[in-house]
Amino acid sequence: MAEIERARQLRKKETWAEKLVWSWLRARRFTGYKFRRQHPIGIYYLDFFCEEAELNVELDGSQHGFPDRRKHDLEREKFLQSRGIKTLRFWNSHSRRNAQSTRDTIFNELQARAPHSLPEYTRPMKLVEKS
């Protein structure tokens, strides 16, 4: 029960980048794949996890650039890899400035990892730049 409460707290404190990416991934909007936010696996909470493709999408703020945090992130990735889970990492700033690139990277990884690939026409629509 503590895991569920912790996940709820993390969802309430999401960053602007997490809100942006969640708007793409929630409710199977992203080519029909189901993602969960702040999904607990072991002692870790994954930002966005797709069980079907065993894919974890992480959004990192500037604190992840510090050596001790990078070491922690590496340990976490090794733990997840040992369970067959691939992690994609994006800087928060990248997810906004390069939104289409971020979406394409997630889509391509889903295509490579999911038990069934989707036809190209299911690729998420290109983002339209606001003027």
Regions found by a protein language model. Give the residues of each.
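Basic, amphipathic alpha-helical patches used to engage nucleic acids or provide basic targeting signals
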Residues: 9-14, 20, 37, 42-111
